[in-house]
Amino acid sequence: MEDINRLLQIRKTVLQMLSDREYIITAYEQEYPRESFVSRENLTMYCVKKDDPTDSIYVFFPDTPKVGVTQIKKYVDIMKDRQANRAIIVVQQNITPFAKQALAEFSQEKKITLEQFNEAELLVNITHHQLVPKHILLTKEEKLELLTRYKMKESQLPRIQTNDPVARYYGLSRGHVVKIVRPSETAGRYITYRLCV
């Protein structure tokens, strides 16, 4: 019973993450009935981006504690069928070393992005913590405007790592720029920008 509560909390965090990444969340996904939970595989979700219907994402919840290459291949096939270009795999423990290698290979070969999160990472939405400032992903146009306004090169911006927890939450990849808004006692708010590397 407690496991169901834990899974539904993780699912809630994933829905918030997808919403923050500007994916459309259906009413059914939001109001997922507790009674319809049978297995982790039932929690699988498919969403499309608000402004770009060709940009879609899958969220997989594997039943097995350790995820192997065969399961990764199965997920990639499912993605191909629906022409999804991104996926999040929420694992119970870890994925095998061969599966990690397969994730990297599929990402390079097939031009798809496979992200892996442990369940423990998604129990709490880190962006709701009071010490985590608001992060806003800039569009390409906003990024260009920022660089021209301050007459600077991309390499001169402060950096944020791709493996940073907030960068992973927002699905940032190399070259993305985020606007970070922090509260400030003197100025009201302090804005900074970071380049994902």
Curated annotation (Swiss-Prot):
Keywords: DNA-directed RNA polymerase, Nucleus, Transcription. Transmembrane segments: none annotated. Its main location: nucleus. It comes from the Eukaryota. Pfam families: RNA_pol_Rpb5_C, RNA_pol_Rpb5_N. PANTHER family: DNA-DIRECTED RNA POLYMERASES I, II, AND III SUBUNIT RPABC1. Component of the RNA polymerase I (Pol I), RNA polymerase II (Pol II) and RNA polymerase III (Pol III) complexes consisting of at least 13, 12 and 17 subunits, respectively. In RNA Pol II, this subunit is present in 2-fold molar excess over the other subunits. This is DNA-directed RNA polymerases I, II, and III subunit rpabc1. It comes from Dictyostelium discoideum (Social amoeba). The lineage of its organism: Eukaryota, Amoebozoa, Evosea, Eumycetozoa, Dictyostelia.
